[in-house]
Regions:
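RNase H-like polynucleotidyl transferase catalytic core
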Residues: 22-29, 97-117, 133
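Short, glycine/charged-enriched secondary-structure capping and boundary segments
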Residues: 13-16, 92-96, 120-121
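Short glycine/proline- and charge-enriched loop/turn segments
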Residues: 16-21, 100-104, 122-128
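RNase H-like DDE/DDD metal-dependent nuclease/strand-transfer catalytic core used by mobile genetic elements
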Residues: 59-104
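RNase H-like two-metal-ion nuclease catalytic core shared by retroviral integrases
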Residues: 81-83, 90, 106-128, 139-141
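C-terminal anion-handling pockets and recognition modules
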Residues: 118-168
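Extended, low-complexity cationic-aromatic segments
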Residues: 1-65, 165-168
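Short beta-strand segments
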Residues: 1-2, 77-85, 107-109, 162-163
Length: 168
């Protein structure tokens, strides 16, 4: 489980340009941000996510509660967390303790967020939903993100991101 931030300003990824020329990109003039909390369910191959206006303890606790209520209690839920400050807050530790009988929390080493498998999906999401595009308002970005998230949870869609179930 992890969170990512999506912004209104354009992100340029793999763009053709003539040598010596830099592409000029229009921008809306001000940055606005939106946050997505997400967890990948290895059993169902689906992404459980929640949009949030703020990336803080309250949003994190709300997502953990939503996550734990959306999965069956047959097996423990493995939660992989990085060292964001709000993951270590008193309220965050309280909600993780509340669900400790149904979950196993693994803390990543500091500055090693790339070890979290969902980071690969966040890169895919940003490439497909908002790279090389100009959005006038943050609602357009959110709509684009929602469409890619919907594709991800459609198991028959050929454009979805597929996780490798084996590691070398």
């Amino acid at each position: 489980m992890d969170e990512t931030t999506i912004g209104l300003l354009s992100v340029i990824i793999r763009c053709w340009m003539k040598r010596g020329k830099q592409r000029k990109i229009q921008t809306p003039g001000q940055q606005k941000r939106w946050h997505i909390f997400g967890a990948y369910n290895w059993r169902t191959d689906e992404l459980i996510y929640m949009n949030a206006k703020h990336k803080n303890t309250n949003s994190f606790c709300e997502f953990i509660e939503m996550l734990m209520n959306s999965v069956s209690g047959e097996r423990p839920v493995v939660i992989v967390l990085d060292n964001a400050s709000y993951h270590h807050s008193r309220d965050s530790k309280a909600i993780l303790a509340y669900f400790e009988d149904r979950s196993m929390v693994y803390w990543l080493p500091p500055y090693c967020s790339t070890l979290n498998p969902i980071e690969r999906y966040w890169r895919h999401l940003k490439e497909w939903a908002c790279s090389n595009c100009l959005f006038k308002v943050i609602d357009d970005v959110i709509q684009s993100i929602e469409s890619v998230l919907t594709i991800q949870n459609d198991l028959d869609n050929p454009n979805r991101f597929v996780y490798s179930k084996t590691f070398c």
